């Protein structure tokens, strides 16, 4: 998770901080230490832990006592490398680094922050002072306060004495000189110095929808710690841990430390094998100064009594939030000043915690002052652990848990409800992954996780159901959506439950298989004529259908997403739709087709053109009773300047119409997505129009006044997230689809290179003879140009796709003069079916040459195998990669990595190639599978990797099959259906 960088505030603590206010010190390490962009290894793997790094003048002083203290303390400090492997509650899956220190050497207990241990699944290891490492498991994370315990086996540390630090919260004093010794900014060991300036600071606010500590004082000092120092011990000159580093202001040198009073109590419970009880009345208190308490109604005599009782006291605890339906609801109100509990005067949060933790299920008497009046209220203390979720559900690609006390407190709502911690798959909601509350699904209320589970068991796969939901940031606005239940791609329907004995989360499958999809019945629908003056064009709306693709798996470098565009029905009798590969990038998708915004039916990908950027989708026409029509297609190509009618669908999927003209027709070379190459359309005669509506619409058509379709209007993916809208002439593609009339799939032949146009001037410079230039000038009636080759693809065997080379200028193909790509297309169109090469006459190095150029079949361009391993999505290098790269290091290409997975933790790297595993070659996916089957659970393997830029490096990776099992997706060559195979590793 990126660091939350706050604005510096000058007001007192009674004002909540900005959302970008403070940063928990390890939060930015997912980017800086295990970045999916940088793919850099951490400094800790490369630098000597024995060389202490002193980062301030005070730390480098020659005080022998401090030097001795530091030498002792560093033996207890460990660097924690960890992954939070799944979204849960307030936390997102991530890989990061932090600090911890040993508090019990005999039992092997490490103290660190709660936001490091996390509320959800945790995997990590600790690196000690001498570079020994051992696995750690979480044994406790506090529901509220920012501390948790990790456990390791002391016997695993063989070459150094395991030392512990004693906790002495009583030694934290204003003015006390301290050292923060930890993993600051990812450095292996940094020593930061400072002086304690406050003991009574309210907890920092890290923002909404994230973990925040509360109901405790924090210690403040200026130590300039940063990311990675979370969990560092704050020690005094005598070597005692007086506090725990927790957070800080990233715009100043201010740091915040957690007092270790309650930490010490929890540690004693663990050491004595006793439960760590945590009580609550669901009230948040704030420490407010006496001047504010007076304004809230505190009487002078009460202030005097409290000051005399506690001379060092500067304020009182004042209620800030009382949760509805909690134990104190209706009894304690905002602004009440706390005086005593069970007759014992209260001056600090520590005493409140002590009383609540020891009175769970018991009634306590709370004395408060409200508006100058003394009041005594009685309420029963609840169990804080019972309102802290320890389970999550995975279904339909999303994950859920019961609403936690943490989030309920942030928004002052009852601690109940179904919370979505990862809204994806069937439940993708506005690209916001968390913060959602589901009120009902399929018209059935879902007040909690258990109810939701029972509801989901009775919903069939592929069923459409209604969803009512809200976002925590705007609970006043109820939202409504129709969702399609996906239990086939996202087949997991299991409950994960925390197991504090093993440190793992145990998975329970809740249903063997979903209910069968509901049977579809034919339906009718009404069309409304287009708002256009030409009668022949009004009914073209009957030739449009909305194509909705759901991409469940990041394949071919396309991340999972949903896309919707309108396609043109090219054969209503057989149910074929012409649409864009922007919407249908590959065939590992779910397709639905919507007719007239009324009928929704499943579709299927039947053809993907490897270069021209279009796809053919098929639906069952027997399910549609509406009068869908096949439009008339023109057999004459468009010309520049020709008047046409543009009918398009904008981003809101509303139809727009404009009379315009063709402004240009040219071969457009789209930019390649540099960060992760993916499919891009090439070698198309792109049609541009003289209308601003063109770039506002991602789908549509161009027609004449007689209603004849002249061109398809499509969206094309470019670099980054840019989308380009252009037309493609029907005469350039309809001949390729003649197979469909006979019920056959197109198996076309293409030249797998990218062509571009060059001017006569450039042609002369490159050596094209004048006689050929004269021929070009004589033939051209629109643009004076020739075709050249800027890029050549390679095949999986690392050979060039054909005999052409970069920079070749094309003169003729099969003795036909070439001035545009359409000329090459026509030559291929007229070839006999058994011909697989054509004759090119080219200019290369200012020499005219004749070449035999081989053609490629379209069947060579689709992906048919995917492997999941340790969170990495691996496949053979797809066509988008082979269009760009010069040489393939391996046939195992990483196209995506899961957050929090070993692949991201150990930085396999997206766009990288795995060439060897444990020194065994992995030239393809099948060989890779053979090798990894021998790697046992929780064991390390060595991986040799080559980057996209051909830079080799080696990496080690520790497998984790419990959270990230190995599986394979295979496409059946006959049925074209995908199936998943689980791969079992050796035990």
Where are these regions (language model features)?
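Residue-level recognition of conserved beta-strand edge/terminus positions
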Residues: 81, 127, 181, 237, ...
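A short, polar/charged loop-to-alpha-helix boundary motif
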Residues: 123, 251-261, 449-452, 590, ...
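A short, Trp-centered hydrophobic/proline-enriched beta-strand micro-motif
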Residues: 72-87, 180, 538-555, 646
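Active-site region of chymotrypsin-like
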Residues: 153-165, 190-253, 257, 317-320, ...
């Amino acid at each position: 998770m990126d660091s939350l960088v706050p604005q510096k505030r000058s007001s007192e603590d009674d004002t909540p901080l900005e959302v970008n206010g403070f940063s928990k010190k390890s939060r930015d390490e997912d980017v800086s230490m295990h970045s999916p962009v940088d793919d850099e290894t951490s400094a800790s793997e490369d630098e000597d832990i024995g060389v202490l790094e002193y980062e301030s003048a005070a730390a480098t002083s020659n005080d022998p006592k401090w030097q001795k203290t530091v030498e002792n303390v560093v033996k207890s400090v460990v660097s924690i490398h960890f992954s939070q492997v799944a979204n849960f509650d307030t936390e997102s899956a991530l890989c990061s680094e932090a600090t911890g220190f040993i508090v019990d050497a005999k039992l092997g207990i490490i103290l660190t922050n709660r936001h490091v241990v996390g509320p959800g699944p945790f995997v990590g290891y600790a690196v000690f002072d001498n570079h020994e490492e051992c696995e750690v498991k979480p044994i406790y994370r506090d529901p509220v306060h920012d501390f948790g315990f990790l456990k390791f086996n002391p016997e695993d540390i063989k070459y150094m004495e395991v030392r512990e630090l004693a906790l002495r919260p009583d030694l934290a004093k204003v003015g006390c000189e301290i050292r923060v010794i930890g993993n600051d900014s990812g450095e292996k060991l940094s020593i930061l110095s400072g002086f304690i300036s406050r003991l009574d600071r309210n907890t920092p606010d890290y923002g909404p929808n994230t973990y925040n500590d509360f109901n405790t004082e924090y210690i403040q000092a200026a130590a300039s710690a940063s990311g990675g120092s979370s969990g560092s011990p704050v020690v005094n000159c005598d070597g005692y841990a007086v506090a725990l580093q927790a957070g800080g202001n990233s715009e100043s040198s201010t740091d915040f430390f957690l007092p270790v009073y309650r930490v010490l109590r929890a540690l004693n419970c663990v050491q004595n094998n006793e439960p760590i009880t945590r009580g609550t009345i669901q009230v948040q208190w704030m420490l407010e100064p006496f001047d504010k308490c007076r304004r809230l109604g505190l009487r002078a005599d009460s202030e005097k009594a409290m000051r005399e009782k506690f001379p060092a006291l500067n304020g009182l605890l004042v209620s800030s939030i009382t949760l509805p339906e909690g134990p104190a609801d209706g009894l304690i109100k905002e602004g009440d000043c706390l005086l005593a509990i069970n007759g014992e005067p209260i001056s600090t949060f520590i005493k409140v915690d002590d009383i609540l933790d020891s009175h769970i299920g018991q009634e306590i008497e709370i004395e408060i002052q409200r508006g100058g009046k003394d009041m005594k209220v009685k309420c029963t203390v609840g169990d804080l652990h019972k309102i802290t979720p320890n389970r999550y559900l995975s279904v339909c690609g999303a994950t859920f848990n019961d609403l936690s006390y943490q989030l309920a407190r942030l928004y002052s709502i009852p601690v109940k409800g179904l919370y979505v911690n990862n809204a994806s798959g069937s439940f993708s909601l506005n690209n916001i992954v968390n913060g959602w509350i589901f009120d009902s699904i399929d018209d059935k209320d879902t007040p909690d996780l258990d109810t939701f589970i029972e509801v989901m068991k009775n919903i069939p796969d592929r069923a459409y159901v209604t969803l009512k939901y809200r976002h925590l940031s705007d609970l006043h606005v109820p939202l409504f959506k129709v969702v399609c239940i996906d239990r086939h791609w996202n087949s997991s329907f299991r409950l994960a439950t925390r197991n504090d004995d093993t440190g793992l989360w145990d998975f329970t499958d809740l249903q063997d298989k979903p209910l069968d999809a509901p049977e579809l019945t034919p339906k009718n629908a009404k069309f409304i004529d287009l708002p256009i003056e030409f009668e022949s064009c009004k009914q073209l709306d009957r030739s449009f259908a909305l194509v909705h693709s759901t991409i469940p798996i990041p394949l071919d470098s396309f991340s999972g997403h949903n896309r919707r565009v309108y396609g043109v029905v090219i054969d209503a009798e057989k149910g074929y739709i012409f649409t864009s590969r922007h919407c249908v990038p590959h065939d590992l998708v779910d397709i639905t087709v919507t007719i007239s915004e009324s009928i929704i039916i499943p579709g299927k990908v039947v053809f993907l053109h490897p270069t021209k950027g279009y796809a053919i989708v098929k639906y069952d026409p027997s399910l549609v009773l509406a009068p869908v029509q096949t439009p008339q297609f023109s057999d004459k190509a468009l010309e520049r300047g020709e008047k046409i009618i543009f009918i398009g669908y904008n981003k809101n999927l509303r139809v727009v119409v404009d009379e315009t003209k063709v402004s240009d027709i040219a071969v457009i070379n789209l930019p390649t997505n540099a960060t992760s190459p993916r499919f891009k359309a090439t070698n198309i005669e792109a049609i541009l129009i003289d209308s601003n509506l063109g770039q506002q619409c991602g789908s549509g058509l161009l027609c004449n006044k007689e209603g004849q379709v002249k061109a398809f209007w499509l969206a094309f993916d470019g670099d980054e997230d840019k989308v380009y809208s252009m037309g493609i002439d029907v005469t350039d593609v309809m001949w390729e689809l003649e197979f469909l009339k006979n019920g056959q799939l197109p198996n076309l032949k293409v030249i797998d290179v990218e062509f571009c146009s060059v001017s006569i001037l450039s042609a002369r410079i490159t050596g094209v003879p004048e006689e050929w230039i004269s021929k070009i000038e004589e033939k051209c009636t629109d643009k004076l140009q020739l075709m050249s080759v800027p890029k050549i693809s390679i095949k999986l065997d690392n050979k060039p796709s054909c005999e052409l080379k970069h920079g070749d200028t094309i003169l003729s193909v099969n003795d036909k003069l070439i001035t545009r790509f359409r000329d090459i297309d026509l030559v291929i169109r007229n070839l006999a079916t058994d011909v697989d090469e054509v004759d090119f006459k080219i200019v290369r190095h200012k020499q005219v040459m004749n070449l035999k150029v081989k053609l490629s079949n379209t069947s060579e361009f689709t992906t048919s195998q995917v492997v999941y391993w340790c969170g990495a999505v691996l496949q053979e290098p797809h066509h988008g990669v082979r269009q760009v790269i010069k040489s393939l290091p391996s046939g195992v290409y990483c196209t995506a990595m899961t957050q929090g997975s070993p692949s991201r933790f150990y930085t396999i790297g997206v766009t990288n190639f795995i060439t060897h595993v444990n020194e065994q070659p992995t030239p393809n996916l099948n060989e890779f599978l053979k090798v990894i089957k021998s790697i046992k659970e929780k064991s390390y393997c060595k991986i040799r990797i080559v980057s996209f830029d051909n830079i080799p490096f080696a990496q080690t990776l520790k497998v984790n099959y419990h959270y990230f099992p190995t599986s394979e997706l295979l496409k059946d060559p006959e049925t074209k259906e995908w199936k998943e195979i689980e791969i079992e590793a050796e035990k």
